[in-house]
């Protein structure tokens, strides 16, 4: 799929299903089914309910997506990568 045909959005994993499929609630309130990308499978990146993730959605089907990045949490519990230093 060309990179021009995807929409990147952030969300939170709400439910883990079988076969590396997750129910993700996006920041705009929509719920979608998302699978782990091949690169995340290859590197054994584990995902759990409550994790913040970046999801790529196809412009042709906005109900399914691919999880491409898991956001790390710092010790304070806020998102890392916000640009603020403590």
Curated annotation (Swiss-Prot):
InterPro entries: NA-bd_OB-fold (IPR012340), RNA-binding_domain_S1_IF1 (IPR006196), TIF_IF1 (IPR004368). It comes from the Bacteria. Keywords: Cytoplasm, Initiation factor, Protein biosynthesis, RNA-binding, rRNA-binding. Residues 1-72 form the S1-like domain. It is found in: Cytoplasm. One of its GO terms (cellular component) is cytosol. Its main location: cytoplasm. GO terms for molecular function: ribosome binding; rRNA binding; translation initiation factor activity. The keyword Zinc does not apply. NCBIfam families: infA. Component of the 30S ribosomal translation pre-initiation complex which assembles on the 30S ribosome in the order IF-2 and IF-3, IF-1 and N-formylmethionyl-tRNA(fMet); mRNA recruitment can occur at any time during PIC assembly. Belongs to the IF-1 family. One of the essential components for the initiation of protein synthesis. Stabilizes the binding of IF-2 and IF-3 on the 30S subunit to which N-formylmethionyl-tRNA(fMet) subsequently binds. Helps modulate mRNA selection, yielding the 30S pre-initiation complex (PIC). Upon addition of the 50S ribosomal subunit IF-1, IF-2 and IF-3 are released leaving the mature 70S translation initiation complex. PANTHER family: TRANSLATION INITIATION FACTOR IF-1, CHLOROPLASTIC. This is Translation initiation factor IF-1. It comes from Pseudothermotoga lettingae (strain ATCC BAA-301 / DSM 14385 / NBRC 107922 / TMO).
